Amino acid sequence: MSRWKLGLDGFVTHFMVSGPQEEPYFNEAKDKNQLRYEAYLRSVIAEHKPVGETGEILVGEKSRLNEEWKYYYDSGSCFVNISTFYSVMRRIHFDIATMLETSSDIDVTAALWSYAAVDVYCNGRLEGALKQPVYKPIQKKELTLHLKAGRNLIYLACENLGVRDTRSVAGLQILNHKDEIKVSIPDEACADAAAVAEAFLESARLESNKLCFDSSAPAGTSYTYRYHEEDFAKAKIPAVWYQAEGKNEILLENGQPYVTVKVVLGKLELKRVFERTEQLVPKYALREDGSAFSFEENKELIFRRIADVMSESRGEKFGFPISNILARKHFNDNSMDDERLMYEMLEMIEERYDCSDFLMCGLIRYLHNYPVEGAMKERIKDVMINYRYWMDMDGFDGMCFWSENHALMFYTCAMNAGEMYPDEYFPRAKMTGRELHLYGRNKVLQWLDDVEEYGFEEFLSTVYMCVTFAALINVVDYSEPEISKRAAAVTDKMLSMLALHTYKTGIVAPMGRVYRSVLYPFDQGAMALMNLINPKLPYTFGEGWLGFYASSHYPIPEGLVKLMEDDVETNYTTGNARVYLEKNDDYCLTSVASPREPFTRWENETLKEDVDITTHNFTKSFNERFHGTTYFRPGTYGYQQHMWYAALDGEASIFVTHPGSTSEEGDMRPGYWHGNGVMPALKQQHGLLGGIYVIPDEHPIGYTHLYCPECRFDEVIHEENWIFLRKETGYLALWCSEKLEAHNGMNFNCEQRAYSKNAAYLCVCGGKKSDVSFATFKKRAKETSPSYDKESKTLTAQEFELSYAACKDVTQFL
């Protein structure tokens, strides 16, 4: 029977998993403070029922949860991670089982890591527990496992509250006796098959147009190019799988950036996803002669692309169709069953799916522009009157109200819905339409006041700026003139910031919130906005948010293309952040200061007693707790903040993060590439950026990693602790205090890791204009003579100096 060694840093990496078991969850408790309310729900959701007899734990058989046991495989991961997004609230159970084998009786110290509530059993004995789930940061519990000679069943019973992005994650780290322990799985008959399938998948190498393996593919091996569909109608179509049994290489089609390889051996199924970085390229909409379309022509092309998608996919379960319907109405396009889609959408709004405010905002735009009669009119009225427009109104759901984009969505929806039905009574709000209109109007004004004074918290987010754009143009189009004018000015500011950070073919920017698209500046959602402004740029679908613009009178401001194209070296503030940007013909370097110069951050009101929870200031404070702070300081727990980039264009970019997850599976914030588990110290000056990453013992991931897609550069040189990069006339150099080691996960030849909890990086930028040649640049970069003192945590490079002093931010514990 196959056995495995412990993984990186002593983590157990081979498990069987049952679940998640998902049940509708309802709690009669009420609290107008949603922060306190969800904390309460997490405190009571875990039942901690004794596991009792587990029975035989076999792949394909049912567990005590009445869910099948599966062998868990996630290439490179140190955790079981079955995180996902829940649009409605759920009670979650999942069980994890593994076998630890030893030749003698030993007491082993282990660390349990999880966001869930977890009971840990060793041979049926409860050894320790995490009592309740948390949102963030991850919990750690040290415990003793009393192992007997032979096989020891380790059983983790996990419980969680499923609400929005839910971290169903657990890991077990062995802290001593590591060399005396081997790992297996309870299903002895499946262990050998699992080892064969896993060894085959782990041997994979992406080489040009083929995927190569060290051995022939086992029976039951197949592959597909299917990964993600923007159109929910297409997402429902089964993937096409191609047989690969007996092959030791798979020839891959051009234009297919994703390939998933699956091995099925009996009831055992393992998958690994590969991303072919070089196959992900900018998409242009140009005339046959290569010239750009006019603004008006390009705008129509944008609307056509959105109209051709039936419904924007929100995963495998449902789609959001309103942007697509709005685009089709622009063309008077009746080719799809939009009446059915509208009724399905109204049901989602009525059930108050998370993000149903997006649908409501689009519905309001629809009603302002297109007539509705009969049963549809009455159905819409009923849904709108009975909607929950804010978290202190009656109702139980898992909607996110408080992020910068969601808050404005809800505020403007309340303002507009109340105005549409002034004499109707809105029972959840306990207001008439006139009262709800004034309520929403007041909140919109508070939101505008805040952004005008402080700037955006979700600054430069290439995901959420698209959402905020849609909400803002609703305010522009459907508000009284003074409010409309202010909303237009804020929209102008948002687009100006994005234009300022548009470099050659992509948006290169630090961001308040980001997702995995951070790897591809040319393919980020907000490039849809930049392509609208400048048709010469690559386009993206941008989740179809520009469907709202098809019926808007908001004018794009002048001068944005010039902002994109001009050289600049500047810094500015937004939220609590100070952003640095330097861009020229050769390179772009941008970051947030961490820490920034002494200043007074805005006060988080959730930390105060007897605070007025009805104000937008409280909502903004609430958002900082959930979605991460813009008060960047070393040692602070991160969320979705992206802190720096160096780029030679929208494809050839690099950055370093401390990952929040050890693999790309599961819906994690922070993730493997987006966000940071713990924030570094950062300092930028002309052509130079230094970073110090110190990982505390309270965080389970003990390395940092560099994203460096070598296929995007014309020349790549590895030399001791340096990597030198050239593309056309631009040059980058990256130094690390640790020896960098290549790692291939979902992408190949894109990642370098520093296996240290205390490491420094120096990025040097240059180009032909300042350095004449690449060789001259290399010499100049080396002459900075970077040095890092681990004890004092100080990085020096000629006149450059940066020190690390760890900070703790109480707002980031939830």
Which role does the model predict for each range below?
Residues 102, 106-120, 154:
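Aromatic-lined ligand-binding clefts that engage carbohydrates, nucleic acids, or primary amines
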Residues 90-92, 96-108, 144-149, 203-204, ...:
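Extracellular and analogous surface-interaction loops
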